[in-house]
């Protein structure tokens, strides 16, 4: 099983993200709209049986409270993989190739294709500032009560570090590029 979480304050990107999805392999795509600061959004996929749209008005940075809201919706004992996909990114084709090979008794990281001068970020280094949320997939049962810090910009790295501290023996690094970084912001230059 696969649950994808997208915190959303850029709904204009959702159609492009949708096009990168393989819904035969997705059980649920949680789109959590950031309605803090008086913002409001119209649901786009109300009739899609695999998409759950919700609004969450807790203030924070980078959609972190919205990610936490979706995590709270998923049974904490579930073997389902959780993957966070930011609303400025799409799913890399290699992700769909790797997904069926993953075992829900493990946590996985992989490499990332970036459009900047660094170009590639290796997923084998579990340190804040050295790993991005798109490089990481985890069964919900290993997240437990760990959550993203709502006000910290690099909360994704800290979230991964916290899970690694608790379950380091379960981490497996796949030396393949299986994700992008800010693909939609980079003008698809990745």
Mark where each language-model region is.
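Conserved short acidic donor-positioning loop in nucleotide-sugar-dependent glycosyltransferases
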Residues: 21, 33-37, 87
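Active-site-proximal specificity loops/subdomain of glycosyltransferases
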Residues: 37-78
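Catalytic donor-sugar/metal-binding loop of nucleotide-sugar-dependent glycosyltransferases
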Residues: 162-180
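Hydrophobic targeting segments
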Residues: 1-6, 21, 27-31
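Short beta-strand-to-loop acidic/aromatic patch adjacent to the donor-nucleotide binding site
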Residues: 79-90
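Conserved catalytic core of nucleotide-sugar-dependent glycosyltransferases
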Residues: 92-161
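Active-site donor/metal-binding and catalytic loop motifs
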Residues: 115, 134-135, 174-190
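Short, well-formed alpha-helical segments that are part of the catalytic scaffolds
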Residues: 10-23
């Amino acid at each position: 099983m696969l649950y994808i979480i997208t915190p959303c304050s850029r709904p204009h990107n959702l159609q492009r993200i949708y096009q990168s999805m393989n819904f035969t392999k997705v059980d649920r795509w949680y789109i959590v709209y950031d309605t803090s600061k008086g913002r409001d959004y119209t649901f786009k996929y109300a009739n899609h049986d695999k998409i759950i749209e919700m609004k969450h008005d807790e203030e924070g940075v980078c959609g972190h409270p919205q990610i936490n809201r979706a995590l709270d919706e998923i049974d904490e004992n579930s073997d389902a993989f959780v993957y966070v996909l930011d609303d400025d990114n799409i799913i890399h084709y290699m992700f769909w190739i790797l997904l069926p090979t993953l075992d829900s008794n493990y946590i996985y990281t992989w490499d990332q294709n970036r459009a900047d001068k660094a170009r590639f970020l290796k997923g084998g280094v579990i340190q804040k500032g050295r790993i991005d949320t798109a490089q990481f997939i985890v069964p919900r049962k290993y997240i437990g009560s760990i959550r993203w810090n709502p006000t910290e910009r690099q909360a994704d790295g800290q979230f991964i570090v916290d899970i690694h501290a608790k379950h380091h023996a379960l981490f497996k690094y796949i030396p393949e590029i299986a994700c992008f970084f800010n693909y939609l912001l980079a003008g698809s230059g990745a």
